[in-house]
Structure formats: C-alpha cells, structure tokens
Amino acid sequence: MRSSWMFVICFAMLILYTNGRILRPETSWEDELEDDLANNKRSLACSCEDGSGRTGTHWIFDCPKGWADCGGFRCCVETSK
C-alpha cells in the first residue's frame, strides 16, 4: 500500500514539473487561463475578409483582448492603441 502512495506522489510531481509551470499562489486562475489562451496563438498569417486588404493572424480560440476579428476563420488583427 505504501509503494502505491509513493507512486502517486512521484507521478503527480513528474506531471507538475514536466508541464513546465506550477501555479503560484499570487496568481489567479483567470490570469493563468488568459496566459494559456495567449500562448495558443498560431504563427500563420491570414487575409482579412472585411475588404480592408489587411493581413491578420490565426488564433485557435477567439481573438484575445486587444485584438479584433476581421473576418475569415478566426483571423484577428491587433487593434490600434
């Protein structure tokens, strides 16, 4: 029985450390989720279908904050500041 608990603990530690990040207490789940979504940006260019002729970037999920959908399949452009 003791060896099975050690296996579970070692397996959990392996997952946490190979994942490359451990949640820090000072960060919230929303911040972590937002970072994860921002990291899911694809590096593929796309052409906006709104007639502007702009080139955007494909995103796996919806456009993040500071970006706008310009038509096409999840084609987003950075909004002007």
Curated annotation (Swiss-Prot):
Keyword annotations of the record: Disulfide bond, Neurotoxin, Signal, Toxin
GO function terms (MF aspect): toxin activity
Signal sequence region: 1-20
Disulfide bonds: 46-75, 48-70, 63-76
Keyword Repressor: no
Keyword flag Signal: yes
Tissue: Expressed in ectodermal gland cells. In adult female tissues, highly transcribed in mesenteries (gametes-producing tissue) and slightly transcribed in tentacles, pharynx and physa.
Function noted in UniProt: Has toxic effects on zebrafish larvae. It causes contractile paralysis and twitching of the tail within 30 minutes, followed by death within 40 minutes. Does not show any toxicity when injected into arthropods (cherry shrimps or grass shrimps).
Other noteworthy facts: Negative results: does not show activity on all ion channel tested at 10 uM (hNav1.1/SCN1A, rNav1.2/SCN2A, rNav1.3/SCN3A, rNav1.4/SCN4A, hNav1.5/SCN5A, mNav1.6/SCN8A, rNav1.8/SCN10A, BgNav1, Shaker IR, rKv1.1/KCNA1, rKv1.2/KCNA2, hKv1.3/KCNA3, rKv1.4/KCNA4, rKv1.5/KCNA5, rKv1.6/KCNA6, rKv2.1/KCNB1, hKv3.1/KCNC1, rKv4.3/KCND3, hKv7.2/KCNQ2, hKv7.3/KCNQ3, hKv10.1/KCNH1/EAG1, hKv11.1/KCNH2/ERG1).
Name of protein: N.vectensis toxin 4
